[in-house]
Amino acid sequence: MKEHVLVILPHPDDESYGVAGLIALNRKKDIPVTYACATLGEMGRNMGDPFFANRETLPLLRKQELINACKEMDINDLRMLGLRDKTLEFEDDEYLADIMEEIIDDVKPSLIVTFYPGHGVHPDHDACGEAVIRALYRKKKEDRPRTICMAITRNREEVLGEADVVLDIKEVADIKMNALRAHRTQTEGMLRELEEKLKNNEPVMATWFEEEIYWTYQWND
């Protein structure tokens, strides 16, 4: 199977926080990456630091920020799915799975990255991951692409075990930082603090730009 990475996440900036290193490493190998972003994050509370957005302008700003971040990561196949922020958990399960199945069948990925259902903390994260997995369960097990997931709950290792995919992303840390910077409304204040902590070599913050970890989804059929 030809290599092709498909990232399916609910919000602009989810990809930059959690998957930018993986994306950049694959693009450096000239492996195509498709990013399907379910919403524009238009219900987000952050409006820049200092404020430069408002509730009316935020959707278009976040759309452009997403486009800018994808340019930083060299993603040339960005698909905006047009779902409403903070509503994914209320959508019909099969309807969401239909959307994910259509993308998967079109892209024919060798690798899918999404949130691990039940370990996304945010309801949209879990609903997105659940929809992807539901779509994949419709396929024969041997026809499912490799699927790795982000898990950000505090009990993730207790429930899932240790992450089995650990990527060294130090060589693309600058790309990850620039992708995060692109999401200005969401990250400016945080990045100022982060960069100060990085200067002081605070270990917890430094690991953000040293490695990304994922869990291979465990099928139960």
Curated annotation (Swiss-Prot):
Highest rank taxon of the organism: Bacteria
Keywords carried by this UniProt record: Hydrolase, Metal-binding, Zinc
Function according to Swiss-Prot or TrEMBL: Involved in bacillithiol (BSH) biosynthesis. Catalyzes the second step of the pathway, the deacetylation of N-acetylglucosaminylmalate (GlcNAc-Mal) to glucosamine malate (GlcN-Mal).
Binding-site positions, Zn(2+): 11, 14, 125
Needed co-factor(s): Zn(2+)
Source organism per UniProt: Bacillus subtilis (strain 168)
Gene3D superfamilies in UniProt: LmbE-like
GO molecular-function terms, A-Z: hydrolase activity, acting on carbon-nitrogen (but not peptide) bonds, in linear amides; metal ion binding
Keyword Repressor among record annotations: no
Family in the record: Belongs to the PIGL family.
Lineage: Bacteria, Bacillati, Bacillota, Bacilli, Bacillales
InterPro entries associated with the record: BshB2, GlcNAc_PI_deacetylase-related, LmbE-like_dom_sf
Gene from which this protein is expressed: bshB2
Catalyzed chemical reaction(s): (S)-malyl N-acetyl-alpha-D-glucosaminide + H2O = (S)-malyl alpha-D-glucosaminide + acetate
Protein name: Probable N-acetyl-alpha-D-glucosaminyl L-malate deacetylase 2
Keyword Zinc attached: yes
Deletion phenotype: Mutant has normal levels of bacillithiol, but bshB1/bshB2 double mutant does not produce bacillithiol.
EC code: 3.5.1.-
